[in-house]
Amino acid sequence: MTKEYIVIAFTENQIGVLNRITALYLRRKINIESLKVSESSIRGISMFVISAFTTRETIDKLVKQLRNIIDVIQVEYYSNEELITQEIALYKITSKIFRESGTVDRIVREWNARIIEMNPQYVVVEKTGTREDIDAMRSELEQQQLLTEFTRSGTVVLHRDSVEDKLQANLSRKQQRNTNIGFKTRESWQK
């Protein structure tokens, strides 16, 4: 059965890692719904958050392949229920419509959004919430023909359990393994 899975990968912050990761999705013909890459709590380690709809069997195989990428330190997959997830969306509304319609003000209050910019041409409204809430607010603004532009972030996540200890242990294990088999670090290549 197809459902949404969120893959979280911690990698060394190196050129080409994003390409290698997304290439595996392409090979398995998995459409990426959301992709976010940011610095993790450990300096020099990036955190990839990739959301896609697929089967459990396919995501199992994909994660096994992701673990084989040399720069990947740790990778796991989760369902939405296992993580704290949020997205940020920006909605642009024409100022004239905003002034003439009490509907926009009601929608902003109802969806617990906030106005972050207002000028003579347009108003920008920000909403932080679940994907479902962001989509519902967008749908309501579109139905009222109020929305002129829309954008959203990728899924931002936090684990319900701490992952730093496990990540640090995996990083140390990887560095030790590379030292034991004689791999040079990227830093030593550059000297």
Q: Which residue stretches match the model-derived regions?
A:
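Long, contiguous binding/interaction regions
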Residues: 1-47, 53-191
